[in-house]
Amino acid sequence: MEALKYIEEKKRKKKIKKTIALLMVLIGLLILFLIKAPIFNINNVKIVSNDNEVALKDDIENKLQGIKGRNIFYVKRSYIESILKNDPYIKDVKVTKALPNNLTVEVKENKKIFTVEQNGNYYALDESGKVLDKKLGEDDLVKLEGITIQDKEIGEKITEDEKILEIIKDFGALINSNTSSIKFNKLDISNLSNISLYSNEVLIKIGGNFDLTRKLNNAVNILKSDKVDIKKGYIDVSVEGNPVIKEE
């Protein structure tokens, strides 16, 4: 009797295993059918940019033409990111898939902040010191002086000097985040202990590359002040304490 129960139990377990295996095969075939179905072929790629630059969006769309019509499950996010991150104008990429066949590509663009002149050529740089453009004309950017450079290609850093790059990055980040009406037109780093920033004809004496947020905030507040109304001269924010203001 016990032996009969054992045999029946064994048959029941075997039947359950077969049923589970069959279900897994059927589910696998269903999944395979679904992911290969034409409905999952990418037919729409939406480009979202922080600057809404039309030319860059068109360029991105051209680069991603090859993924249209491909199965959305087989196109890896990392593949799309690797295609776009080679573009010096693109700082960051985020890819979102929306089933059945839509992709959203969010790009954060590198902005032109500085311009450096060499032998009549003007290099436009982003806030990290990377070359974004090279042209004969001068852009309406912050002119960077006091740096010796060799011929550079788009996408390369303007210099190999890490200390200079750090200064460019620090100032670039602050200038890029400046939302006030005060604009800067020149940064002179020929003397790293006595860095100079200009807003039109007003010299802002920065001193060394430290405590920059405080220094620039002080300078901007003075330039915006109706009580001071300085148009030409200098503002010395290089040391702690009250800035020194000299009008000419």
Where are the regions that the model predicts?
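Charged, solvent-exposed interaction patches on well-folded alpha/beta domains
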Residues: 1-36, 40-43, 53, 58-71, ...
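Extended, alpha-helix-rich binding/interface surfaces that flank or overlap catalytic cores
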Residues: 47
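Cofactor-binding loop segments of dinucleotide-utilizing enzymes, especially the Rossmann-like FAD-
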Residues: 50
